């Protein structure tokens, strides 16, 4: 997979999930509304955090999004099913990048063309203190190693 959103980072696939395109996801233009793509990505992100036992805890710590982006490449329409692939970049002290691909699942059950790609910078915070904290070791173990630039 070529990582067009962050070409200098080697992509590390950590999660794949499928979900239906719902009738209510569409707007007056007859296609999935642009805001819904962020919901799809959010669901994939939280599904991965649940899978690795790092579900956000409002009374403790968890991830917050400080920047999110999405490139809309092809329209999605109801009915259909999508596959969302989640990739991660190397960790910082309290943050890492997540990248997502949204593909329409074909009639043959295989994921087809790329319809959207997006991502977010995730910062781990202590919610009551409203301060960033170091990433949990459970998350760091799942992220690709940090690459040092020449001369560093």
Q: In which residue ranges do the predicted regions lie?
A:
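A broad, structural micro-motif
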Residues: 32, 63-65, 115
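Small beta-barrel nucleic-acid-binding modules, principally OB-folds
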Residues: 59-80
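Membrane-helix exit/interface motif
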Residues: 48, 52-54
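Catalytic strand-loop segment that frames the active site of acyl-thioester-processing enzymes
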Residues: 2-47
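HotDog/MaoC-like acyl-thioester-processing domains
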Residues: 1-17, 72, 76-79, 89-152
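Residue-level recognition of specific faces of alpha-helices
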Residues: 37-40, 64, 121
């Amino acid at each position: 997979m070529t990582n067009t959103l962050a070409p200098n980072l080697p992509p590390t696939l950590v999660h794949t999930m499928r979900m239906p395109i719902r009738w209510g996801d569409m707007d007056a233009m007859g296609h999935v509304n642009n805001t819904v793509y962020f919901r799809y990505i959010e669901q994939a992100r939280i599904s991965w955090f649940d899978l690795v036992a790092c579900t956000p805890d409002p009374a403790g710590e968890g991830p917050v999004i400080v920047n999110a982006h999405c490139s809309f490449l092809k329209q999605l329409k109801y009915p259909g099913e999508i596959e969302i692939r989640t990739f991660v970049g190397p960790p910082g002290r309290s943050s890492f990048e997540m990248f997502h691909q949204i593909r329409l699942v074909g009639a043959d059950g295989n994921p087809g063309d790329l319809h959207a790609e997006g991502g977010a910078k995730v910062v781990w915070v202590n919610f009551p203190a409203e301060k960033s904290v170091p990433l949990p070791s459970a998350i760091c173990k799942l992220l690709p190693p940090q690459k040092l630039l020449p001369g560093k």
